[in-house]
UniProtKB/Swiss-Prot annotation:
Transmembrane segments: none annotated. This is Diaminopimelate epimerase. Pfam families: DAP_epimerase (PF01678). It comes from Laribacter hongkongensis (strain HLHK9). Pathway: Amino-acid biosynthesis; L-lysine biosynthesis via DAP pathway; DL-2,6-diaminopimelate from LL-2,6-diaminopimelate: step 1/1.
Length: 278
């Protein structure tokens, strides 16, 4: 089977985007792992699948698969690339679209300067919504990792995040603690682990160890979760754009507080088009 794909990236978080509207696509986890291999396949952090919507009031359905073959609920950098893809490939002429995900509808909007802004929906904090094993919601939960007690803020942006504040992201134990947090027993569906350094009330540095992918150059939902966590902790300003510096570049995140959606703005870039035989 020959498969047409588009390689895209958002701040170095890279994707293979597949058009499931114009071609029928049914991939097994094993096939996705092969496609994700950077030596023998396409190579990507996530595979994004564009499909027709289930609800006629929406424009598309958006499915996300990590390079380990597992399907996940949400991907912020991928959402921007998704919006750029469907517009550039003539699947829509709208600059604002409604996109179904496994955890609700998101609304990406393309700007004339090439940036994409996405309404990522409101964050969730109840332990059952993460999911996270805890008696009740708290701004900071204690989590035992490698004999140490970490203070983490848990946030669902449609996918689960555990965010901790560190003094220096460059020396933070991302590769050592990341997989331990990801697979911690208190996160039944695993979790994305964020390491956030506060620069000012409107700027942070961030590294994220992503569930099923490892550390990536940037994580859009991780940036949203980090800003939300910082605001909940009283470290960042609400309803003000916060600059998130990742290893792949900058995102702008804005959240007005409880009950409001998180707005994410950043780039989405096409790298190349291709065709691969499975």
């Amino acid at each position: 089977m020959k498969l047409k794909f588009t390689k895209m990236q958002g701040l170095g978080n890279d994707f293979a985007v597949l058009d499931g509207v114009r071609q029928t696509i049914r991939l097994t986890p094993e096939q996705i792992r092969k496609l994700g291999d950077r030596r023998f396949g396409i190579g990507f952090d996530q595979l994004l699948l564009v499909e027709p919507p289930q609800d006629a009031g929406n424009d598309f359905s958006y499915r996300i698969f990590n390079c380990d073959g597992g399907e996940v609920e949400q991907c912020g950098n991928g959402a921007r690339c998704f919006a750029r893809f469907v517009f550039d490939h003539g699947l829509t002429d709208r600059r604002e679209i409604r996109v179904e995900t496994a955890r609700g509808v998101i609304v990406p909007r393309l700007a004339d300067d090439g940036l994409v802004t996405v309404d990522m929906g409101p964050p969730r904090f109840r332990p059952a919504d993460i999911p996270f094993v805890a008696a009740e919601d708290a701004v900071i939960h204690e989590l035992e990792v490698a004999g140490q007690i970490l203070g983490v803020t848990v946030v669902s942006m449609g996918n689960p995040h555990a965010v901790q504040v560190v003094d220096d992201v460059d020396t933070a134990p991302v590769t050592a603690f990341g997989p331990l947090i990801e697979n911690h027993l208190r996160f039944p569906a695993r979790v994305n682990a964020g390491f956030m350094q506060i620069e000012s009330r409107t700027a942070i540095c961030l590294r994220v160890f992503e569930r099923g992918s490892g550390e990536t150059l940037a994580c859009g939902t991780g940036a949203c979760a980090a800003v939300v966590a910082g605001i909940r902790r009283g470290l960042l300003d609400a309803d003000t754009p916060v600059t998130v510096q990742t290893r792949g570049g900058e995102l702008r995140i804005r959240w007005a507080g409880d009950g409001h959606p998180v707005w994410m703005t950043g780039p989405a870039v096409t790298v190349f088009e291709g065709e691969i035989t499975l």
